[in-house]
């Protein structure tokens, strides 16, 4: 396979359709253990029909919101929107209706494509989004006043069939979506940051941002690899690496229908690759640990299947012990680093080139430097700005450089090392700067620590910990708070006084998290 870099999403989809037309592009469940598939040729055709339907509604170039779980109709909608010259605004399906409507108003949305499970959003949008002109339902039972996506696709297919029987076929073809050029530097997607603190911002990403980010590095993913997609579809990491990267190499994308059924769906779809956040990886690690003592190949077959070989991890810090654990079963865990503002990958680890403690090597289309300890990056993946937020854009971008807000540096070979977030820095009474993430990462290596948040409280450093009760029970720990204090005391012995944790708080519940499973910090 000759590897190529693409500059528009439309190029990726066209390449996939031309090269892998009869291969399965998407597989999804239609019952407990039944699967249906759609080919690359089918999704290419359906997305073109949807592009044409959008144009006939007068919405070409419009901002179109997408609200739904990962599904075949969601993918058809997204490709139909961006390949037809409009702007997709994917939103978190789990957000309250009021918040979704606010985001649609802020993004100047004039058309909404929505899943049937959010009929409450349809009602709210009709009442509170005056600019909204059309609502299209992706489901089988559209709410009152909604257009049916299925009917729009069928009608457009019929229109094309009629046109192609007439003598003006060539003239008509000139006006179809398939002949229209897409500007690589045109805005195509607005993604709202989930944000661990503060107001979410609409990140403006161009065709080039997304297409080049997904394809600028040949990660040696085999053609037609089977990928199980478990991350939220509105999340940049899923969109770029599961979908766009997957389409560029002809992968079969299998849709996980629930986070409660990941283990079952691994057995059903038999994937080779998965993109995950550390919380998910830790959950699967427990299944491996529960089978300790059995031959590695037996355990791997039971949990993942013999064909499974790679996990890409991103979104948060991953305890290195888990990388070693999965390696014993012949599974590579490759870490990456990125942010929505970079579409989203900045650096990634590949199996043949790794360095201890690094989050990965810069992508070929990216350069980085450290300014006063903060990592700045520049390249074709960097956003054009925040939608209608000029002050925030000016604060984030300087001469093409994106200020990541992360504390870190890059070595001579382009490997990135992180120490924390600039905005989370704790300034001690004697003027020392302490990165809470640095402390959190060290404490997280202890199995009794399920989740931890470090902050300043009344002039001292405090660690709030949600313990791993399952591990405590398994290992016979009766006094969990006392054992956690021992962990804190052990940590304190090895660090300077200004980095020591002087207060421990034990939680009874998990921390609230963002859609990408990051712990929410206080404003």
Predicted regions and their residues:
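Conserved AMP-binding A3 loop
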Residues: 37-41, 188-214
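Conserved AMP-binding/adenylation subdomain of ANL enzymes
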Residues: 211-226, 233-298, 302
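Conserved structural elements of the adenylate-forming
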Residues: 44-49, 184, 203-223, 230
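Conserved ANL (AMP-binding/adenylate-forming) active-site segment centered on the GW(Y/F)…HTG consensus within
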Residues: 354-356, 382-405, 436-441
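Conserved AMP-binding/adenylate-forming core of the ANL superfamily
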Residues: 26-58, 62-71, 75-79, 96-101, ...
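AMP-binding/adenylate-forming catalytic core of the ANL superfamily
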Residues: 95, 112, 379, 385, ...
